[in-house]
Amino acid sequence: MASEDCKQALKLLARSRNVLVSGAPGTGKSKLLAEVALAFETAFGLAPAGGPPQLNPMGGIPIPPAAGAVKDIPAPTKMDRKVFRTVFHQNSKYRDFLSGITPAVNKVAAGPDFTIVKGTLYRASEHAKGANGAALLIIDEINRGPAVQVFGGAIVAIESDKRLASDGAKLAETQFFEMLDPVSGDVIEYALPHDL
């Protein structure tokens, strides 16, 4: 059974899609985020992570903890739910969060070689863009890293009213930003999905 703080955090995420948890060290922020992550992945037991419900003749019937709980979670109709986590620190980089070029150190080649990295926000966004996908991005210690540098153009695009529509369509308010496409290597315009 989820705690009241967890339910409140999920309700806020369903409404605004962004929640900032703050407090003094040792007050239970990490524990709350772990509980929120589990509740998000399982949708309070209504939508098991990893696919549609499976018949289990020995299992119980999943019942929401309270009336209306289904709508009080982010992306209640999405079944492919995944949590992505990252921790910000002094050396956090844009390339680790969105995309960028890094040296390929394990390749045997005549000269230097580079690879394009898919960052945490990019991977979460691509998962949420899937037909049945929803992603929860947990950024721990956001105040310890250079957040503006790490987010880059996504700092505005992460606002809930600046994202794509729930069907992936562009809206008048959708905020696009340029980034290096990890697949093609080209600079592309990118927007964040509704179910992130």
Which sequence ranges carry the predicted segments?
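AAA+ P-loop NTPase catalytic core and its hallmark functional loops
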Residues: 1-196
